[in-house]
Amino acid sequence: MNTQIEYKLLDARLAEQLPAYATPGAAGLDLRACIDLPLEIAPGQTTLIPTGIAIHIADPGLAAIILPRSGLGHKHGIVLGNLVGLIDSDYQGQLMVSCWNRGSVAYAVQPLERIAQLVIVPVVQAQFRQVDEFEASDRGVAGFGSTGRG
């Protein structure tokens, strides 16, 4: 699928490092920390980091999600403070990344370091219909852990 999304470059340093798919099979584009100096995130601390880019998806059938980079989370404990960022199709502001240090050691984010990834996803705005009872299903109301392990 080839979908065009408008973007604004808010930090000239990104001109040579625009978000791009690294491989033909890549789902996400890397977002960078557009900061001037290293930014230390202490254990347990959350900070909001600008990416230097704004997007306008425009198509109400699409949205974007911001996800953590697996290496930062696994090696350094740096994940998203809001776990997943949701960017609606009508949002036009700068993309910001909430970084949370869930680790036990401070981590210094470097200027233009890749800190998160952006994935474009389809959206369905479902119509809801109130009912008194649901049609029976195999699972019913069985909740957390009800399907077992393995």
UniProtKB/Swiss-Prot annotation:
Which GO MF terms are attached to this record?
dUTP diphosphatase activity; magnesium ion binding
Q: Which family does it belong to?
A: Belongs to the dUTPase family.
SUPFAM superfamilies xrefs: dUTPase-like (SSF51283)
For this entry, the protein name equals Deoxyuridine 5'-triphosphate nucleotidohydrolase
One GO BP annotation of this record: dUTP catabolic process
Enzyme Commission number(s): 3.6.1.23
Q: Name one Pfam family in it.
A: dUTPase
Q: Which residues bind substrate?
A: 69-71, 82, 86-88, 96
Name the keywords, alphabetized: Hydrolase, Magnesium, Metal-binding, Nucleotide metabolism
What is the documented function of this protein? This enzyme is involved in nucleotide metabolism: it produces dUMP, the immediate precursor of thymidine nucleotides and it decreases the intracellular concentration of dUTP so that uracil cannot be incorporated into DNA.
Q: What reaction is this protein's catalytic activity?
A: dUTP + H2O = dUMP + diphosphate + H(+)
**Species name for this entry?**
Leptothrix cholodnii (strain ATCC 51168 / LMG 8142 / SP-6)
> Coding gene?
dut
Q: What metabolic or biological pathway is this protein involved in? A: Pyrimidine metabolism; dUMP biosynthesis; dUMP from dCTP (dUTP route): step 2/2
